[in-house]
Amino acid sequence: TDYSDLAAQCLPQVVSVTNVIEVTSTSNGGSDLFNFFYGNGQNQNQTSTQESEAYGSGVIIGKTEDELLMVTNHHVAVYDKTGNTMYYSYTASTKERKVTFVDGTEVEANLKGADSDADIAVLAVKLSDIPEDTLNAISVATIDNSDDVKVGQGVMAIGNALGLGQTTTFGHVSALNKDVTTSDDNVTRSMMQIDAAINAGNSGGGLFDANGH
């Protein structure tokens, strides 16, 4: 079966999301080993700041007079962690968010709203920041009712798999209403199970039916 027309229809509705994370580490001044390698020899706390990037996906769900709106996962859009080890403590939080459209154009995005319990977030990009050619290349997704999904129907997943850009995978709906308890926040959610390949970076991406909805 040829799904090229379906892919061509849906790819413009999906974006890649880059979360730029700022990590600040502070050494424990009392750690002789850490101070030996990273300190100033005076047994004082040392602070360093670095940046890293995390990748995910999003789906274009609306356009206002001023903004383009995209839905993604909370854990893709928001990063906020603190921790301690024997040698240092650290904080890591989102510094900025960027989205990349189907034509490769990358622009800064703002967090419009988020719900960590539902693991959902909405990003917004100013229309004035998007080139006209890009606006003509992208489109808004059609959202259908998940209550109408049936076991066995075909699906196409699109996302920024492994942070390497948009990828399409195909499969079927394997089961519905699966109660799954997540390991990170111990929240139980009712899930749809599919057998299309889903990789790191697909989070927040689109799952489309045969009509491209």
Identify what each model region corresponds to.
Residues 1-213:
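Serine-dependent protease modules
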